[in-house]
């Protein structure tokens, strides 16, 4: 039974452009335009920069001699501070010191994660045009609001200057990393931050993919399946990849863009806030200076507990004459964060399921991000993989910048034999599909499909004499397009008038190596075609929306199935009725073969059925099935009698016997 496009219906496609990172794509071409291309890991809590030089990657130390730089920006009455200088003065200047801005970038102000963060940071997050902005006093007491992109740009500028000091020349081009589960709005905002920092962001690369390069660059030989577990200061990613002689193919990705070391710090802080209240009857939760001191000590304690079983948290003159001196054991730390640690296993399972691999098929578990030093996290991962030890061969703080620098070397043409065979194949995290009659999202390309990709399918019209078909492009996991996201639309006009179901319209979806989507529709009879290019649009899905789509798809799978069955039942009835109506009015079919009362009976039955359909737009599947049986009970005996009189075989279910093709096409 053919499905169809309604008058306003669409061919829809869901495509994600996240991280279409192909090292081979126009590398030589770009190299002629680019100078040295640095690799920057723009992290929630720390950032890192590297460059590919003289056949290997150099991770560049900052002016303090450190290879990682705090992603902090501070404002005083006289200057702006970035990195260690900003973090070191945060306790005495909390309201004017900004950190964790990666948790705001590309998000909407009303996002629940943003609202949660507003309560946890000492600086002011305000609403400007629906986006979260940071309001601080800068020099001379002037109040200013900054977008998250502007603050990120300040950190990128610091990394750029660090590289320039080392290389002794100006740098204009960079590869910047983002979490694999960042959505397009977050990616676009990151690119914008690069522009503000005076950088051409030559490529956005996914953090786990970059880390996989760091792990696999020198690995020769046969195919290996690796799982990259990337738990940083503010975000969490899991990617499953296959590495085979320089080809890095991402099989699946999953994650949480709001889970990391900062959350573990907050749990320790909450514990001590309650302890101080109980012991000293003092509430420090509203005092930003006290919280700043506590935050710094809690982070230090957390780090120490990765190698020690107990630490002492000591802060003199914390608040109102109270000195804090309390022990914190590793066991207590693990208990405080137990649910968060266990939460990381969900995306691991989903990524494994999507990759279609068994636990025993993973050859290496690669740990990335400072939070993977936590023994409990390593133990949970080891238990999940039934005793397999995670690989600790890459530096968890530097691996992402290392991979980004390799990609930069390829793009600049400075890569040598070590990089010449590297090929990165990343994936689209959401399903692509087309809409057919009733708003059904017909899924074409599943999430985690390797891109670039191309898919064509033939559709037909829903109405008689339909000359225009509306093509709309969607993304999402649900069964109906109303629950998916529209990316763009266009019309194919000039389709020659014909009965419904006759025209053949070929729709082609193609995503190139740069993540740009092209959709083309062509009428095969006339050769008339139209196409649309959808670049990464701003205001795309927030991570919350992506998570909601997948979660709802799981929760409402049964409900979606029922709705789809109902639409299919309605379409079956409608198609049968229109077929009968056309046959009794077409002289080449049944019109001249029917006796007067037979024709009247069929016309009355089809007329009554169409009126019933108009009045029963939202009936249940069973009602449509019952109505179809009623119409068939009237029409089928008459059709059988006609064919017996003419010596032919009856058309099954009243289908046209002149139909040449068995293959049915979805209708547009």
Curated annotation (Swiss-Prot):
Signal peptide: 1-23
Region feature (Disordered): 643-668
Places the protein is found: Endoplasmic reticulum lumen; Nucleus
Protein keywords: ATP-binding, Chaperone, Endoplasmic reticulum, Nucleotide-binding, Nucleus, Signal, Transcription, Transcription regulation
Tissue specificity of this protein: Expressed in mature pollen grains, and pollen tubes.
InterPro entries attached to this UniProt entry: ATPase_NBD, BIP_NBD, Heat_shock_70_CS, HSP70_C_sf, HSP70_peptide-bd_sf, Hsp_70_fam
Tagged with keyword Nucleotide-binding: yes
MF (Gene Ontology): ATP binding; ATP-dependent protein folding chaperone
Cellular component, GO, one term: endoplasmic reticulum
Disruption phenotype: Bip1 and bip2 double mutation affects the fusion of polar nuclei during female gametophyte development. Bip1 and bip2 double mutation affects pollen tube growth and length. Bip1, bip2 and bip3 triple mutation is pollen lethal. Bip1, bip2 and bip3 triple mutation affects female gametophyte development during the early stages.
Subunit structure: Interacts with BAG7.
Function noted in UniProt: In cooperation with other chaperones, Hsp70s are key components that facilitate folding of de novo synthesized proteins, assist translocation of precursor proteins into organelles, and are responsible for degradation of damaged protein under stress conditions. Involved in polar nuclei fusion during female gametophyte development and is essential for the regulation of endosperm nuclei proliferation. Involved in sperm nuclear fusion with central cell polar nuclei at fertilization, which is critical for normal endosperm nuclear proliferation.
PANTHER family in the record: HEAT SHOCK PROTEIN 70KDA
Stated name of the protein: Heat shock 70 kDa protein BIP2
Gene that produces this protein: BIP2
